[in-house]
Curated annotation (Swiss-Prot):
Originating species: Dictyostelium discoideum (Social amoeba)
Biased composition (Polar residues): 100-110
UniProt keyword terms in alphabetical order: Coiled coil, Cytoplasm, DNA-binding, Nucleus, Phosphoprotein, SH2 domain, Transcription, Transcription regulation
Coiled-coil stretches noted in the UniProt entry, renumbered to this chain: 471-577
Protein name from the UniProt record: Signal transducer and activator of transcription C
SMART domains, sorted: SH2 (SM00252)
Posttranslational modification: Tyrosine phosphorylated in response to the chlorinated hexaphenone DIF. Minimally phosphorylated in the absence of DIF. Phosphorylation increases during development, is highest during the slug stage, with a strong decrease at culmination.
The entry's DNA-binding region: 662-706
Chief place of localization: cytoplasm
SUPFAM superfamilies xrefs: p53-like transcription factors, SH2 domain, STAT
């Protein structure tokens, strides 16, 4: 072609920096070289826009291969090729290569993808499998990665023309592919449009711009395709082998994990076994330690016992000194107490005079007001409740403090008087409604005996003949009880008048008096309970405390009935309630009763209490019901008839019912109580059943052998109740009470009760001298004490000998040896054995060269007192070695025990059996067996 073509432009217009590097063709050249005609054809094609039509014609001439599914590869966001800043790639069209199967294979980057578009169906299937395997491998193992498409190349098999690849000066291969005839054409930013005039100038650079010769050699293509297929098959096999290896590796890992888990479980089992063995060893060690601790505790107890014995000896010496000091303190306290009484009497007398003057002035004012005003019927005063007349609602019963302050009571009285004087001008009431001032002043005068409780109430001192603080309080409570009884009788008269003709002044005063008296009674009950729990009392003191607690409780019930009746003026009820109560005022319980034996000397007395104006009609008689107490709770006895006389008539005058009980059946060692009930009716009302509180517990036995266990059950219930532990003083007082009943002694004049030394012996021997007695220690004590009490009650002459002091009773072996150490030969002493419950032991003195063997002890056996006609005195009389007996007496001045020796026949002769004396058997010694 000539260089005179007007469309050719010189290549000098191209930038001088454009470097062209001729790239060697990948395949051998077939003699085809790119010419200027080819470039002209390309430019003509671009200018005429017929490239698309020619492309379609060429596609119609060539057989269309059946399209195969191609794997979807991620397309880059930008179709622009990436160029080096120093180079520019120029792509041209080469005719005859656009439809060649190797037209896209000239690029090394897109070789694999172009081959897939030109192979047959089998090759396509293999390639698809390969791509699928590659995708699976990419998803699961991340081993193989699909070859990304070439930068700037669109993977579209329908594009008929493609530009060959040129190589820039850097040696990098780039490919620019675009659809001819489309609206948008990707143009290199450095590419300049070449027209026909410039084609001749481009010939100068043909030698440098040698395109890659693409040879359409079927043999080379087929060999290359087979080689690529073989490589793909190898890759697939390698991938399959890799997957199999991975699966095997996973299986091995799972097996390894299972083995580790199995080993871990075995280790855990071994650890558990080791822990169990360690626990067993620890338990064995703990058991050994407990045994050692028990042994040490036993040794410590023995040491403590020895130490306590020494302390007791020292305490006895200190006690004498302490008594002397207390005697002086008691005298001072008594003087202070008398001074307080005198001062209080003076204050009360002054208050009484002031109250009388105020009442007289008030009565005069009321009388003048009533004369000036017309009289009104009395019923009009009751139509409106007093609540509307009073400025303040009356006081109710409040919790009771332990101490009573007389000054507070006097202030209340003064306040009441002030209210009366202030309200006297209202003109309420009439001359007939005025209460006599003497009655009100007498009620107030009864409160003059209110005494504050002394601060030394909690001092724990043993009882004696010296007047002690708790004895003073008991005496004061006795005086208050008599004064309160008189006060209740006068209060009944006043309340009748108040209910008949209500006045707010007298109502307020009477309500305050009832509240004050209720507080005083509760304070007395509290102080007596504290005395019982703090001091070891003598039998007369025990009797007084029991009597006062019972009487004060009845007074409290009567006062509550009065108060309830008085409050009906403020809170009327329709129909009016039945204000009545049934109480037991006398009872011999707690005690053990023998079946079918009447209680002639110890009757049970029941009294009916009511209000001041309550008119009751007694319907029927009083009925006694036995309530059995067991572990399941209280329930009525199922026996058809357990009491011989269950129903008794009540005296209408005194409203008393007296029972001489006789029980026909035993209670099977279970404690029981009695309740009494009857029907009463208010005039104009309906009948109402009222019932008394239960009596103290008792047990009915059928044989004397049941006494020991039954009395122990009663003592335990009477002492502890629902408590796990109680003070020693309270327990000693309950024990003394049961002991006196068992030995049939009078509380006020006992002949031989448990002395202070005997109680100290019991406290130390069985309870370790602890201030609090646990309920768990009771059974072991009663096993020993109960058998001795059984013998004292039922064995012939034993109880009489006890009361006469011929049986010392509760004393240790060491104390017996000390008592006999300075006595003559043949002197003996009777006591209860410490190791053999219910047996007597005789300690006596003999003539022995060894001083340690001169005091001996003999245990009285059952055969020694066997038979109806052989008693303990008879056994002692038959022993010639027993000549003198030590008799126990109590010093009246100090309360200390004293022993005096008497010839046994002098003191025991009244107890000897009257029978013929048999001659002694010759050749045999009657000396008792030496222990």
């Amino acid at each position: 072609m000539s260089n005179n073509n007007p469309k050719k432009r010189p290549l000098d217009a191209i930038s001088n920096t454009f470097e062209v590097k001729q790239e060697e063709p990948e395949f051998s050249s077939d003699g085809f070289n790119t010419t200027n005609d080819d470039l002209m054809s390309l430019m003509t094609f671009l200018d005429n826009g017929t490239g698309q039509q020619n492309q379609q014609n060429q596609q119609n001439q060539q057989p269309q291969p059946q399209p195969q599914p191609q794997p979807q590869l991620p397309q880059p966001q930008s179709q622009q090729p990436i160029y080096n800043s120093n180079t520019t790639t120029v792509t041209v069209k080469t005719e005859g290569i656009a439809t060649s199967p190797l037209s896209n294979a000239s690029s090394p980057i897109s070789t694999n993808n172009n081959i897939n578009n030109n192979t047959n169906n089998n090759n396509n299937n293999n390639n698809n499998n390969n791509n699928n395997n590659n995708n699976n491998n990419n998803n699961n193992n991340n081993i193989n990665t699909a070859t990304p498409p070439a930068i700037g190349v669109q993977q579209n098999s329908n594009i008929p023309y493609s530009y060959p690849i040129y190589t820039d000066v850097t040696g990098q291969q780039t490919q620019h592919q675009q659809n001819i005839g489309q609206n948008s054409v990707n143009i290199d930013p450095y590419f300049q449009t070449i027209d026909g005039a410039q084609i001749q100038q481009q010939q100068l650079l043909q030698q440098q711009l040698q395109p890659i010769q693409q040879v359409n050699n079927p043999q080379i293509d087929q060999a290359q395709i087979q080689q690529q297929q073989a490589q793909q098959i190898q890759q697939q096999q390698a991938q399959i082998q890799a997957q199999q290896a991975q699966i095997q590796q996973q299986q091995l890992e799972q097996q390894h994990l299972q083995q580790q888990q199995f080993q871990f479980q075995q280790q855990q089992q071994q650890q558990q076994q080791q822990q169990q063995q360690q626990q067993q060893q620890q338990q064995q060690q703990q058991q050994q330690q407990q045994q050692q601790q028990q042994q040490q505790h036993h040794q410590q107890q023995q040491q403590q016992q020895q130490h306590q014995q020494q302390q007791q000896h020292q305490q006895q010496q200190q006690h004498q000194q302490h008594q002397q000091q207390q005697h002086q303190q008691h005298q001072q306290i008594h003087q202070n107490h008398q001074n307080q009484l005198n001062h209080q009497n003076q204050l009360n007398n002054q208050n009484q005079l002031n109250n009388q003057n105020q009442l007289n002035n008030q009565n005069q004012l009321n009388h003048q007001n009533q004369l000036n005003q017309p009289t009104q019927p009395q019923m009009q005063q009751i139509e409106l409740p007093i609540l509307h007349q009073l400025p303040v609602e009356p006081q109710h019963l409040h919790p009771i403090p332990t101490h009573i302050n007389n000054n507070g009571n006097n202030n209340n009285n003064n306040n009441n008087n002030g209210s009366n004087s202030s309200n006297s001008s209202n003109g309420i009431g009439s001359p007939d409604d005025i209460i006599e001032p003497n009655i009100l002043s007498s009620i107030q005068h009864c409160n003059n005996n209110n005494l504050p409780l002394p601060d030394h109430l909690l001092i724990n001192t043993p009882y004696g003949n010296v007047l002690q603080p708790h004895q003073q309080i008991i005496n004061e409570c006795l005086k208050l009880h008599l004064a309160q009884k008189e006060q209740l009788d006068k209060m009944k008269i006043v309340q009748k008048q108040v209910l008949a003709h209500p006045q707010k002044e007298t109502f307020q005063m009477l309500d305050n008096e009832q509240n004050t008296l209720k507080k005083q009674i509760d304070a007395e009950i509290t102080s007596l309970q504290q005395i019982d729990q703090t001091f070891v009392l003598s039998p007369p003191e025990i009797r007084n405390v029991i009597f006062l607690l019972h009487e004060l409780t009845i007074q409290s019930i009567q006062l509550e009935l009065y108060h309830e009746e008085l409050q009906l003026l403020v809170r009327p009820q329709n129909p009016p309630p039945t204000i009545a109560a049934l109480v037991v005022i006398e009872q011999p319980f707690p005690m053990v009763i023998t079946k079918c034996k009447p209680l002639e000397d110890d009757p049970v007395v029941v009294q009916l209490l009511c209000g001041t104006r309550t008119e009751l009609q007694m319907i029927g008689k009083v009925r006694a019901t036995m309530i059995v107490e067991n572990q399941q709770g209280s329930k009525t006895s199922s026996s058809p008839k357990t009491i011989e006389t269950e129903v008794v008539s009540m005296d209408e005058t005194n409203r008393l019912a007296k029972y001489h009980l006789k029980f026909l059946n035993g209670t099977r060692k279970n404690p029981v109580t009695l309740k009494f009930g009857m029907q009463v009716q208010v005039v104009g009302g309906t009948a109402v059943n009222i019932e008394s509180p239960p009596t103290s517990p008792f047990i009915v036995i059928t044989n004397e052998c049941q006494y020991e266990e039954s009395d122990g059950t009663l003592l335990k219930k009477d002492s502890f109740g629902n408590n796990n532990e109680i003070p020693w003083a309270s327990y000693a007082n309950k024990l003394q009470r049961h002991f006196l009943r068992a030995t049939r002694q009078d509380f006020m004049k006992p002949t031989r009760y448990l002395s202070r030394h005997e109680l100290m012996y019991i406290h130390h021997q069985f309870f370790g001298s602890k201030p609090m007695i646990p309920q768990s220690s009771f059974d072991s004590f009663w096993i020993w004490f109960g058998k001795g009490l059984q013998k004292l009650r039922y064995q012939r002459h034993v109880c009489s000998m006890w009361q006469s002091g011929l049986i010392y009773g509760f004393i240790s072996r060491q104390s017996v040896e000390e008592a006999l150490r300075n006595e003559e030969q043949g002197t003996f002493l009777i006591r209860f054995s410490e190791r053999h419950a219910g047996h007597f032991a005789v300690g006596y003195k003999v003539d022995d060269p060894d001083p340690e063997k001169r005091i001996r002890h003999y245990l009285v056996k059952a055969d020694d007192t066997a038979g109806a006609k052989k008693t303990l005195p008879d056994f002692l009389s038959e022993c010639p070695q027993f000549t003198k007996i030590l008799q126990l007496t109590i010093d009246v001045s100090t309360g200390e025990p004293r022993l005096r020796n008497f010839p046994k026949d002098v003191v025991l002769e009244p107890y000897y059996s009257k029978r013929e004396t048999l001659p002694a058997t010759n050749g045999y010694d009657s000396l008792p067996t030496i222990l």
